[in-house]
């Protein structure tokens, strides 16, 4: 039996110092070649910037860096005070309260259906086109949960729930007295309002607020400020005309621990996205694809007493789940 001679190869002979690993270039790679993964920093950064510029929680709240999906806090509920001490006298022990709290991040997802032609876009073209839609979906969902306790809020806390706990509610119209009384609800607990959350439909009501003695208006439409404090407008049908929230927003804390991840699907039926006739969108049948993007966000409220709300006199403020 003849033995087969095996060719001995010197693999180093085929190696070349000039051969470099291929670098991912978003301008050359088509979306149908890269249907999932972690979004590149050059696209994540502008999306997060747009989210932070438009989210009312992120505009007004206090950012806390996070390295994981959970962060533990220790802070003063009642800060220690100082005492006058005479010569030879014993220094009194200050009464203070430490509070331990945990802020946990939850995954926030958005599904955006688009035509199949989008798969022929380059990675850069695709995410440049989708960037504003991704950002808007993220900040609207986060604000509705953290401010109004809407949309299956996973945090277990929100400004609406804090107001419900403390019953810091003023019922009435947009008048100077009611605005002062609203701010006073915080001052009673040695807190100070530093902003208002309103909506665009309230601007005509705000412009009508007049000091009865000086006849001056306390709303400045040029700077969008009320009683010297900034007013931000929340775009949500769940905040009604005639409702106004104020608070010490230093007590509202948020975090963003992870980058944005994405996946493109071509076959799913989207139960949460409807056609004009009310039927679910079927990607395969309708020759579409869907982008699913996810990010983690965290929220914590350090003091429930830091928020109050003005509502119309006939507005119900109890026994309505998820509403205040």
Curated annotation (Swiss-Prot):
Taxonomy, superkingdom: Viruses
InterPro entries tied to this protein: Phage_capsid, Phage_capsid-like_C
Post-translational modification: The N-terminus is cleaved by ribosomal processing protease Prp.
Keywords per UniProt: Capsid protein, Late protein, Virion
Gene Ontology terms: cellular component: viral capsid
Locations listed in the record: Virion
Pfam family, one: Phage_capsid
Protein family: Belongs to the HK97 phage major capsid protein family.
Subunit note: Forms homopentamers and homohexamers in the mature capsid forming a 63 nm icosahedral head with T=7 architecture. The procapsid is made up of hexamers and pentamers of this subunit. There are seven subunits in the asymmetric unit in the T=7 procapsid. Found in the procapsid with the scaffold protein in a 2:1 capsid protein:scaffold protein molecular ratio.
Function summary: Assembles to form an icosahedral capsid, as well as procapsid, with T=7 icosahedral symmetry.
NCBIfam families (UniProt xref): major_cap_HK97
Record's protein name: Major capsid protein
Native source species: Staphylococcus phage 80alpha
Gene: gp47
């Amino acid at each position: 039996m003849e033995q087969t001679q095996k060719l001995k190869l010197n693999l180093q002979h085929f190696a070349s110092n000039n051969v470099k690993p291929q670098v991912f270039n978003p301008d050359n790679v088509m979306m149908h070649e890269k249907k999932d993964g972690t979004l590149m920093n050059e696209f994540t950064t502008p999306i997060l910037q747009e989210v932070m510029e438009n989210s009312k929680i992120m505009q007004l709240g206090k950012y806390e860096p996070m390295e994981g999906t959970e962060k533990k806090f220790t802070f003063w509920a009642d800060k220690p005070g100082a005492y006058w001490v005479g010569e030879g006298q014993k220094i009194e022990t200050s009464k203070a309260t430490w509070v331990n709290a945990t802020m946990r991040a939850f995954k926030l997802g958005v599904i955006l259906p688009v035509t199949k032609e989008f798969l022929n876009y380059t990675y850069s073209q695709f995410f440049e086109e989708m960037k504003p839609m991704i950002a808007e979906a993220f900040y609207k969902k986060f604000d509705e949960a953290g401010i109004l306790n809407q949309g299956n809020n996973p945090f277990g806390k929100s400004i609406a729930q804090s107001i419900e706990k403390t019953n810091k509610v003023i019922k009435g119209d947009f008048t100077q007295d009611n605005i002062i009384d609203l701010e006073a609800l915080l001052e009673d607990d040695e807190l100070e309002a530093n902003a208002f959350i309103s909506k665009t439909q309230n601007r005509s009501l705000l412009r009508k607020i007049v000091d009865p003695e000086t006849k001056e208006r306390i709303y400045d439409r040029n700077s969008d400020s009320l009683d010297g404090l900034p007013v931000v407008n929340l775009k949500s049908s769940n905040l009604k005309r005639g409702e106004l929230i104020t608070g010490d927003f230093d007590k509202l804390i948020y975090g963003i621990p992870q980058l944005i991840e994405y996946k493109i699907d071509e076959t799913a039926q989207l139960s949460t996205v409807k056609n004009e006739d009310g039927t679910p969108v079927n990607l395969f049948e309708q020759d579409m694809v869907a982008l699913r993007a996810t990010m983690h966000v965290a929220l914590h409220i350090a003091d429930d007493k830091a928020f109050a709300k003005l509502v119309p006199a006939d507005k119900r403020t109890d026994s309505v789940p998820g509403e205040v």
